[in-house]
């Protein structure tokens, strides 16, 4: 299985395991559309702080879900949680639909975040265990890139639905889009097998062999994962251990840029419709609801550049030095936002501002959004890899939560211009940290295409 060509079973595993990434991005996009609708239907409207708190609720759930379900799945097996997570997302989304109230929206977003966080803790393992050696890095990247489909599909669907319904009170119906994705996720996993890597780690090589044959066919023999040590024989490495013996540079190199990227992906991503209206990029409309529809339409167009960004990044994965890709990605993101800022301040034509926004999304996803995901497994040893990647991801989610929490406050304090300036500064910081620490931590000769948790 390590050297075989790709076949249908490989693509099936990638498609099924990628649904969590797709649904997570879809939920983030949906929250950014629902929040301005709530501002219309609620009296009094939400404060800037309340908007930020509601917006980051699902991200907090993702952080907790990744830790909790990740730990439980290590003990109980991946498959049960691979099915439980979409059930949780489905139940929480239906709760929001039937209650249509702010407290239950917050509860539902948190529960949906828990389920999606569980997905994030499992998807890359399933993919990397099944893929041939030369395709591991690429296919884990493809799973990450699938999140772009969630951004695009939900934004487009919301635009067409809102244009038909023409009523801001229907915001809760939009959550059924997440219900639909959860149903698809669940149905694709009814007939599925346990993780071969988990079975090997728990001393079940015969069952692992059967799982591999289920996924790839009866003619396939199990590969290098059979040589993994049993879980009880592996050295224990905690986050404190990563700060000893000169490992601090690794933590800075993987953690700080991921946190900086989180502001762009989630802070700007979640509040894109709000930011578009604050920048005056939507067409002049008579009512606030029509302005929301116009902003969602432009959000859809901008989101279309997320997918080409990921594709560009995947094409560069095995060709460019990863530190260079991430550094230039941050710099070009900042340049795109600088164009957007100049267009806003100088009242330049709208198309110039939109080009800046699209450039930001293109290079964000070609560089930092993809690279921060695949760099941690390359710089940590097998014993440190799980803890190292987990700590880097925690930095990323903290950056995302901070971004979503503070974007509405920045809009209140200094308008869209302040949001853009802060975001440019954060991305320049990400470029600086990557450039300074990257060459020391990850020399060119040490790049290893094995993005997995062992």
Question: What role is predicted for each listed range?
Answer:
Residues 1-454:
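Transmembrane-helix signature of 12-pass secondary carriers
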């Amino acid at each position: 299985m390590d050297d075989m060509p790709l076949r249908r079973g490989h693509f099936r595993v990638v498609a099924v395991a990628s649904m969590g990434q797709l649904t997570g991005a879809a939920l983030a996009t949906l929250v950014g559309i629902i929040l301005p609708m709530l501002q219309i239907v609620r009296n009094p409207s939400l404060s800037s702080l309340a908007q930020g708190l509601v917006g980051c609720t699902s991200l907090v759930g993702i952080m907790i879900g990744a830790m909790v379900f990740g730990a439980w799945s290590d003990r109980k097996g991946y498959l049960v949680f691979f099915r439980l997570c979409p059930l949780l997302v489905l139940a929480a989304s239906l709760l929001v639909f039937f209650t249509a109230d702010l407290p239950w929206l917050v509860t539902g977003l948190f529960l949906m975040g828990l389920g999606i966080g569980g997905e994030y803790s499992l998807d890359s393992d399933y993919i990397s265990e099944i893929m041939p050696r030369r395709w591991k890095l690429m296919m884990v990247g493809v799973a990450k890139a699938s999140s772009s489909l969630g951004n695009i599909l939900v934004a487009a669907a919301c635009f067409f639905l809102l244009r038909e319904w023409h009523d801001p009170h229907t915001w809760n119906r939009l959550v059924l889009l997440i219900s639909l994705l959860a149903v698809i996720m669940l149905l694709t996993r009814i007939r599925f097998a346990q993780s071969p890597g988990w079975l090997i780690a728990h001393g079940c090589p015969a069952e692992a062999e059967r799982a591999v044959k289920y996924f790839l066919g009866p003619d396939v023999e199990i590969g290098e994962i059979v040589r993994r040590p049993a879980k009880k024989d592996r050295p224990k490495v905690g986050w404190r251990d990563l700060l000893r013996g000169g490992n601090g540079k690794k933590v800075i190199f993987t953690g700080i840029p991921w946190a900086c990227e989180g502001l762009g992906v989630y802070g700007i991503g979640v509040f894109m419709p709000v930011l578009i209206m604050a920048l005056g990029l939507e067409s002049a409309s008579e009512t606030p609801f029509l302005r929301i529809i116009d902003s969602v339409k432009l959000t859809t167009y901008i989101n279309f550049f997320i997918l080409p960004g990921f594709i560009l990044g995947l094409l560069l994965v095995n060709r460019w030095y990863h530190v260079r890709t991430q550094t230039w990605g941050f710099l070009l993101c900042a340049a795109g936002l600088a164009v957007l800022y100049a267009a806003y301040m100088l009242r330049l034509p709208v198309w110039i501002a939109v080009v800046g926004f699209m450039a930001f999304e293109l290079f964000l996803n070609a560089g930092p959004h993809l690279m921060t995901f695949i760099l941690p497994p390359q710089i940590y040893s097998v014993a440190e890899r799980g803890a190292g990647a987990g700590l880097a991801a925690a930095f990323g989610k903290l950056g995302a939560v901070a971004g979503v929490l503070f974007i509405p406050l920045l809009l209140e304090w200094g308008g869209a211009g302040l949001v853009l300036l802060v975001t440019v500064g954060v991305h320049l910081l990400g470029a600086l940290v990557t450039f300074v620490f990257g060459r020391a931590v990850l020399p060119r000769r040490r790049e290893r295409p094995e993005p997995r948790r062992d």
